[in-house]
Amino acid sequence: MVEFKILEKRPDSIKFIVSGVDVPFANALRRTILSEVPTFAVDEVEFLENDSALFDEIIAHRLAMIPLTTPHERFSLDALELDDYTVTLSLEAEGPGMVYSGDLKSSDGDVKPANPNIPIVKLAEGQRLTFNAYARLGRGKDHAKWQPGFVYYKYLTKIHVSKDVPDWEELKELAERRGLPVEESDEEIVITTIKAFYLPRKFEEHMGKGIREEIVPGSFVFTVETNGELPVEEIVSIALKILMRKSDRFINELHKLAD
């Protein structure tokens, strides 16, 4: 049975344990988050005036990499076909001064730069920059600008430390300071590594003897971080729905072949 347990949730990240799965599923979830969860990003720019020191192409690339808020409640982001919807982000600026992402004017108030303080270009006295940028829904598999964030996972492991190891109390104290669960018996302590835990060098000689590491079968610790386009919990939810939809489509195609 698949189980999820949230370890830590912040406005821009979430850490959780998923149990009862294998490596292919864990990697499929990671790849789906990175390559299949759609977001808005600038896909085309029409320059009307550019007196800045940067070529049009450089500014267009910078605009494309600005994370744009994506209203998940308005679009079927878990659908296999994306909505054909375009948002216009306009700018008319004159130097001197720095042009920031927050200066962009959006035709849709729900689709705008997630961070208004991203610098785009610095204009000198008398320089002007005017353009219309067009943002569309896309997927990370087509371009990194559509990736909703970052995701990585590790095996859930347990470190068994025998009380015969000199200064084992030091490891217990270190693990507790890191916020790691520690179980203690008469013979040993067991540290569950829900996040990175590195042994001090003085204990390395005891690895494989008084200290051993155990991989918990079928359990993985995931960390997902959002760029700001989507709430981090929605990224995971949408990715799981996409996985289910693709699996259903695959099964249906198999049934057609069987018939």
UniProtKB/Swiss-Prot annotation:
Localization in the cell: Cytoplasm
Catalytic activity: RNA(n) + a ribonucleoside 5'-triphosphate = RNA(n+1) + diphosphate
UniProt keyword annotation of Transcription present: yes
InterPro entries in alphabetical order: DNA-dir_RNA_pol_30-40kDasu_CS (IPR001514), DNA-dir_RNA_pol_insert (IPR011262), DNA-dir_RNA_pol_RpoA/D/Rpb3 (IPR011263), RBP11-like (IPR036603), RNAP_Rpo3/Rpb3/RPAC1 (IPR022842), RNApol_insert_sf (IPR036643), Rpo3/RPB3_RNA_Pol_subunit (IPR050518)
GO biological process: DNA-templated transcription
GO MF assignments: DNA binding; DNA-directed RNA polymerase activity; protein dimerization activity
Source domain of life: Archaea
EC number per UniProt: 2.7.7.6
One GO term describing the cellular component: DNA-directed RNA polymerase complex
UniProt keyword list: Cytoplasm, DNA-directed RNA polymerase, Nucleotidyltransferase, Transcription, Transferase
Gene3D superfamilies: 3.30.70.3110, DNA-directed RNA polymerase, insert domain, RNA polymerase, RBP11-like subunit
Function: DNA-dependent RNA polymerase (RNAP) catalyzes the transcription of DNA into RNA using the four ribonucleoside triphosphates as substrates.
Complex formation: Part of the RNA polymerase complex.
Family statement drawn from the similarity comment of this UniProt entry: Belongs to the archaeal Rpo3/eukaryotic RPB3 RNA polymerase subunit family.
Name of the protein described by the UniProt record: DNA-directed RNA polymerase subunit Rpo3
Source organism: Thermococcus kodakarensis (strain ATCC BAA-918 / JCM 12380 / KOD1)
Lineage: Archaea, Methanobacteriati, Methanobacteriota, Thermococci, Thermococcales
